[in-house]
Amino acid sequence: MKHLNHVFLLFVFAFSLFSCGNKNDKKEYNKEEAQVETDTTMAQKTEADELSDSPRHHEWVTLSHGEREFQAFVAYPETNEATKSVIVIHENRGLNDWARLFADKLAEAGYLVIAPDLISNTQGKRRTTDFENPDAARDAIYALDPEQVTADLDVAFNYIKEDSASTGEVAVVGFCWGGSQTFKYAINNQEISSAHVFYGTGPEEASAIANISAPIYGYYGGDDNRVNSTIEASEKMMEDAGKTYKYEIYEGAGHAFMRSGHQPEAEKPNKEAHDKAWKRLKDLLK
């Protein structure tokens, strides 16, 4: 009988250990599972989701000149005072979700922002998002008439400058193709307060530089050889003309680091370049 009691007690003790072990393992498993679920949710959150979650007011406006009509995305800061304004010129993918999210982030920083969709109402498509894929949008970008692009930007400039929520001071920020257009627009519009060129090229003709009145600020990835090979010539032309051209090159970052550096899975150099460039941009816009 004593022997049976001893066996029974051993069985109960072993069962208790086994039960506690399972309970702790399950608790640890749930913690790990929850972390994986959180990380996955963050990684899967798209630019469209972030835009949808934004508390700021967004609206589409229809602008026109001559017989052309085009769309522009406007993002308002949360303030009761007039603010400085910014024109965002999209990259060669058109006014996609990322470009609109960037406009929203500038509004979060306190600026009234307009982002014209420069391929809207071209090739039978009302907006960039109506194109079949980024390649189709890119083809439409490179088919644009340069004079039409300038006219579109002029209309966007006047619209945002005259908005009652604007102080009338307007800066321009552009990326890739839009960065090159930003440099060019500084030649065509002497009223802009500053031009911010993200991995875009400068003009090839030195004579055009004479028309620039705003300071030009460049933001370049260290591994973007195609664009960076043009910096020295731009710097010389600007210096010879007595114009302001200041730039930073972010070591290890590639082309389009502002878009790629925003992604959850961004490589470290692109992420660091993204963060440094954001801080610099906001400091310069103040």
For each predicted feature, which ranges?
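Alpha/beta-hydrolase fold nucleophile elbow
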Residues: S164-F175
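C-terminal catalytic histidine-bearing segment of alpha/beta-hydrolase fold enzymes
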Residues: T244-K286
